[in-house]
């Protein structure tokens, strides 16, 4: 039996509750939906017979809207082509979901303006404008959640690989900005725990996609490393034809070494009184080859100070004094600096890895494992 008509929902309400006492339900209120020409018998060659419009309020704060065309009764899944808009989505309201993945979002507002196309043949999401402002986001690692973190990381990596390899799925950010935000990594599996973070962070993204096929994707980040050291992070991602092709550069200067003290206490049981840290790196990946370097720099670092440490146990005083002596052997006497340049040139470890897998490995191995090389030498 064929039918045709108008379908609507007025002032609807939807609640998602995980049933956990520590998490609040997610609510979508004031749901208004109107579907015109709602039919099970579209005309021939009519992919989207219906006009659809939806507006809603998320957690009493964020406006969400969708307007376009659809075939809601298509088999095996509905077909939708529509503009979408999200205004002032408060990240703290996503905590029940983000918390599952050890992510804490305490502040921040997200605006999205884009277009989506969904069918059994393909999924295409084009975000024309993305703006995230005043966000504070931390990934929290702890001994208790380590097994779960490993499982989540494996699932996320596998899903990312599937999405990248699937030619029917495309997610693209045409233009995105992150303003006045802070992102960090909190390690609660050490004693003491510590936090590595970038504050006052601004990020700009152009033409970035899960499938690098057209044009060059650009990412620019500025901020303050550990709240004190000005940093710049620039990347250019060219189309994969057929292998990853991109450049990365990182510059961190004038970071107060005292900012590292909790990290140093966690791994080396030592303190610093003053000094500066800097880090420089340029990397290029093309034709399954990596070319580049990392260069950390320590300047005017003092590890041991008798006045500062007079109340510490004698054994620890001696240990830190020896560490300071080793650093003295490494320093340039005229400028009192300790530095080394590590060449990273060579073949890509996994020749089948995609761009985002290689970037992840480089950030982890070339940056985070090299961020404290001067301190590694003095331990």
What are these regions (language model features)?
Residues 132-140, 299-301:
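Structural signature of outer-membrane beta-barrel domains
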Residues 118, 123, 167-171, 188, ...:
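Extended terminal
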């Amino acid at each position: 039996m064929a039918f045709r008509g108008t379908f609507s929902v007025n002032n609807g309400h939807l609640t998602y509750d995980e049933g956990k006492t520590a998490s609040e339900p997610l609510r979508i209120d004031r749901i208004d939906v109107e579907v015109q020409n709602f039919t099970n018998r579209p005309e021939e060659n009519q992919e989207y017979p219906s006009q659809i419009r939806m507006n809603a309020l998320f957690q009493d704060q964020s406006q969400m809207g969708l307007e376009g065309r659809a075939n809601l009764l298509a088999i095996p899944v509905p077909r939708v082509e529509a503009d979408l808009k999200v205004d002032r989505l408060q990240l703290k309201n996503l905590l029940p979901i983000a918390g599952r993945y050890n992510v804490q979002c305490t502040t921040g507002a997200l605006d999205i303006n884009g277009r989506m196309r969904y069918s059994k043949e393909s999924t295409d999401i084009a975000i024309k404008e993305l703006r995230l402002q005043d966000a504070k986001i931390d990934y929290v690692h702890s001994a208790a959640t380590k097994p779960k973190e490993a499982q989540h990381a494996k699932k996320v990596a596998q899903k990312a690989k599937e999405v990248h390899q699937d030619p029917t799925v495309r997610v693209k950010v045409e233009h995105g900005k992150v303003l006045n935000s802070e992102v960090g990594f909190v390690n609660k599996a050490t004693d003491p725990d510590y936090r590595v973070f970038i504050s006052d962070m601004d990020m700009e993204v152009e033409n970035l996609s899960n499938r690098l096929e057209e044009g060059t994707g650009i990412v620019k980040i500025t901020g303050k490393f550990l709240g004190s050291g000005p940093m710049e992070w620039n990347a250019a991602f060219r189309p994969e034809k057929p292998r990853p092709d991109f450049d990365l550069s990182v510059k961190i200067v004038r970071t107060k070494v005292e900012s590292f003290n909790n990290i140093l206490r966690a791994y080396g049981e030592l303190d610093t009184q003053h000094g500066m840290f800097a880090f420089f790196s340029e990397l290029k990946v093309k034709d399954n080859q990596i070319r580049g370097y990392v260069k950390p720099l320590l300047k005017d670092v003092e590890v041991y100070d008798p006045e500062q440490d007079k109340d510490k146990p004698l054994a620890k005083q001696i240990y830190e004094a020896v560490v300071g002596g080793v650093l003295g052997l490494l320093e340039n006497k005229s400028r009192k600096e300790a530095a080394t340049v590590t060449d990273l040139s060579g073949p890509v470890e996994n020749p089948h890895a995609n761009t985002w897998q290689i970037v992840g490995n480089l950030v982890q191995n070339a940056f985070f494992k090299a961020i404290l090389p001067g301190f590694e030498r003095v331990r």
